[in-house]
Amino acid sequence: MTIWVDADACPNVIKEILYRAAERMQLPLILVANQALRVPPSRFIRTLRVAAGFDVADNEIVRQCETGDLVITADIPLAAEVLERGAAALNPRGERYSEATIRERLTMRDFMDTLRASGVQTGGPNSLSPRDRQHFAAELDKWWLEIQRKK
């Protein structure tokens, strides 16, 4: 089991939660990005730098993730792909993607893309709140407990 992070867009506060969790759970944490990242020294934490380009990091995560892994991403198409491979997907706000919710999320994403392409100002997501951080940490722990029960 490995925790993969779509690190280019992952908020630093979420990375900090993940660093602590990797140590506590003693699980590999791999941050995939197209730029150099600073991470704390740990035998569980490493970075994987990929070439710059559209979806390069996403494609690498999809290529390497396995059943039972967890992928941290706000990228809905990436979440859909890793779910198909048997991995779990969690966004930085603590929403766990599932087969039931991913289609709805993809449809909404496509709709918003269409609006933006037609010139409508849609705005971006709200800032990450303390409640979002707590929800993320709780969902991460929930995933870990589910994995432990399956052993």
Curated annotation (Swiss-Prot):
This protein is called what? UPF0178 protein YaiI
Lineage from the top down? Bacteria, Pseudomonadati, Pseudomonadota, Gammaproteobacteria, Enterobacterales
S-S bridge residues:
none
PANTHER family in the cross-refs: UPF0178 PROTEIN YAII
Of which family is this protein a member? Belongs to the UPF0178 family.
List the source organism.
Salmonella arizonae (strain ATCC BAA-731 / CDC346-86 / RSK2980)
Q: Which HAMAP family match?
A: UPF0178
